[in-house]
């Protein structure tokens, strides 16, 4: 049976790097992206290198689109590897859209893919270091709301428990990514019964078009690079290498955890030191 890898957000940045990292492993790469031009260009680039890659246009906030994607994947063969890199950052949208894409869309996608997960299948979902930078423990009442993202009134409940603060895109992004990390904990229990695995990955400051946009608009992003002990941004291929490992047989006992790949900036901030000292 055809061994299939599916990568969301595959048109550029870390998603494209993940597709390239999985190219030699899979018989077929399904490159899912909202941007048809990006997905098609990525498929052509990989195809020129001898990889069978097919673009698939999907918006993770669209239930019908996700249903079409899962139907397509089921018809292609055995879905062995999933890298869900699609998402948006604080400068790209209002708070409701950020949560809808980054958390609700992720929850909806994982729910739809669950029946396709068989023994040995593995998934990596992109979260972020953002919630790990918050020095304050999260409110348990907020976490209780956060853990039920598919409720029809989820956004209103989140606004009620967090207050007006969540309307700041950066705050909304951090909470959405915290929700992704916690979603993976629960999904690991469900998938484990089928012999499948799932982890999240939390990148730090990475040199991508999206990351550069954030850095241009927020000086705090540039400050985080300066505090990174390794003294630089990460590269998309460095994130993809970790994703590739987490999806491999070498990581067959890795399940339900978050992989922080940030050059040490969270460690430096928790230690209360300048990362370059």
Please describe what each predicted stretch is:
Residues 1-30:
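Canonical Rossmann dinucleotide-binding motif of NAD(H)/NADP(H)-dependent dehydrogenases/reductases
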Residues 25-41:
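Conserved glycine-rich Rossmann-like NAD(P)H-binding loop of the short-chain dehydrogenase/reductase
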Residues 46-64:
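Rossmann-fold cofactor-recognition segment
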Residues 88-92, 119-193, 205:
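Catalytic loop of short-chain dehydrogenase/reductase
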Residues 197, 254-256:
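Short, small/polar-rich loop/turn modules that mediate ligand/substrate recognition or access, typified
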Residues 203-213:
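Short, flexible catalytic-loop segment of classical short-chain dehydrogenase/reductase
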Residues 228-239, 250:
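A conserved structural motif in NAD(P)-dependent oxidoreductases
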């Amino acid at each position: 049976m055809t061994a299939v890898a599916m990568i969301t957000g595959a048109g550029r940045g870390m998603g494209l790097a993940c597709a390239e990292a999985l190219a030699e492993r899979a018989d077929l790469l399904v490159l899912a992206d909202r941007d048809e031009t990006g997905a098609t260009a990525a498929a052509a680039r990989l195809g020129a290198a001898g990889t069978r890659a097919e673009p698939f246009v999907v918006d993770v906030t669209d239930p019908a689109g996700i249903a079409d994607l899962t139907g397509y994947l089921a018809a292609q063969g055995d879905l062995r590897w999933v890298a869900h890199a699609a998402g948006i950052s604080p400068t790209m949208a209002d708070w409701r859209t950020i949560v809808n894409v980054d958390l609700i869309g992720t929850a909806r996608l994982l729910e739809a893919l669950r029946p396709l997960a068989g023994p040995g299948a593995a998934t990596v979902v992109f979260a972020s270091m953002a919630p790990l930078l918050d020095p304050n423990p999260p409110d348990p009442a907020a976490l209780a709301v956060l853990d039920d993202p598919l409720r029809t009134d989820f956004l209103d409940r989140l606004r009620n428990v967090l207050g007006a603060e969540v309307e700041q895109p950066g705050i909304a992004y951090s909470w959405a990514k915290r929700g992704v990390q916690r979603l993976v904990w629960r999904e690991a229990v469900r998938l484990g019964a089928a012999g499948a695995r799932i982890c999240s990955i939390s990148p730090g400051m990475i040199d991508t078009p999206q990351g550069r946009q954030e850095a241009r608009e927020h000086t705090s992003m540039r400050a985080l690079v300066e505090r990174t002990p390794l003294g630089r941004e990460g590269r998309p291929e460095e994130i993809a290498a970790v994703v590739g490992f987490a999806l491999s047989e070498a990581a067959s006992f890795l399940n339900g955890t978050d992989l922080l790949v940030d050059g040490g900036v969270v460690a430096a901030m928790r230690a209360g030191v300048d990362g370059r000292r």
